[in-house]
Regions:
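A short, exposed loop/beta-hairpin motif centered on an aromatic-Gly-Thr core
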Residues: 22-31
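Short, charged, surface-exposed hinge/linker loops at domain edges
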Residues: 1-5, 32, 36-68
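Short aromatic-glycine-(Arg/Gly/Cys) micro-motifs in beta-strand/loop hairpins
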Residues: 6-21
Length: 68
């Protein structure tokens, strides 16, 4: 399981990224599409790491909300 950030991007697209996997970013026309796309991106990222015999990064982020 991986934490994913989803937020509105440019041109009415949604951006999704996985902070524990550097460079693992995707987008979609809707929030739901962005989530589907980032899931595929994460799966591909992990397969590439395994294929290249590279270590799979641990999930190491805490999500916090800060009142300002």
């Amino acid at each position: 399981m991986r934490q994913v950030l989803v937020y509105p991007g440019e041109d009415d697209y949604w951006v999704a990224e996985c902070p524990s996997l550097p460079g693992c970013v995707s987008q979609g026309k809707t929030r739901e599409e962005a989530l589907v796309n980032i899931k595929e991106a994460i799966e591909g990222y992990l397969v590439a790491l395994e294929t290249d015999h590279l270590p799979i990064p641990e999930e190491h982020f805490d999500a916090l909300l800060v009142a300002v």
